[in-house]
Amino acid sequence: STYYTKDGRFGALGHGIGDGTQSGNLLYANSGDLYSMKLTKIKKGKAGAPGEIGGVVYFGKKSHIGTLDCNSNLGIYGQLDSDELSEYAAEDTYYPVAGKDEIHTGSAQMISEISGKLEKYNLEITNIDKKATDTNKGMELKVTDDRLIELSGGIVQGTSGSPIIQDGKIIGAVTHVSVSYTHLRAHETRSNL
């Protein structure tokens, strides 16, 4: 997930889940279940093609990690199971949320498990539009971390929701991939934090 609070509320993706049709409409869902998954493949992105990650979702009682209660244009939201929250809380760092006026161009990091373990990858925030009409595209990012470029080509489909950290604070999440660049860029949302 992009974030979770100390009481287990989570937000993820940074964009909603679509209905699977060409209309691009949101899937109507006011309840659902969240399950763990295992990353099984990475299709490297390149200019003109976004790349993607693939995985296997494990369904069943032992793999259930939470419940979903909202699917919106800004992401999915819900409640982590108490066992899952205890496990995450023991391992993770809590970050304060930056105010809009604290976000600036320059270095930042994305947190992702794309390598199979939770890691931080270096980014550069290249543009900020604090008046963006599309709340899911408030800034542009460029991957500067050679490890991520080597692994996936940059930001790829399936990395939506990866939190973006700047100056020790969470400033948003990866939401979209732009394929017109050699090292794939991402757009970010911060309105849902």
What are these regions (language model features)?
Residues 152-174:
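Catalytic nucleophile loop of clan PA
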Residues 9-138, 147, 177-181:
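Charged, low-complexity helical/coil segments in non-catalytic cytosolic or luminal regions
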Residues 2-7:
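Long, acidic/polar, low-complexity amphipathic helices and coiled-coil-like
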Residues 141-143:
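Helical hairpin unit composed of two closely spaced alpha helices linked by a short loop
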Residues 182-189:
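Conserved small/polar residues in nucleotide/adenosyl-binding loops
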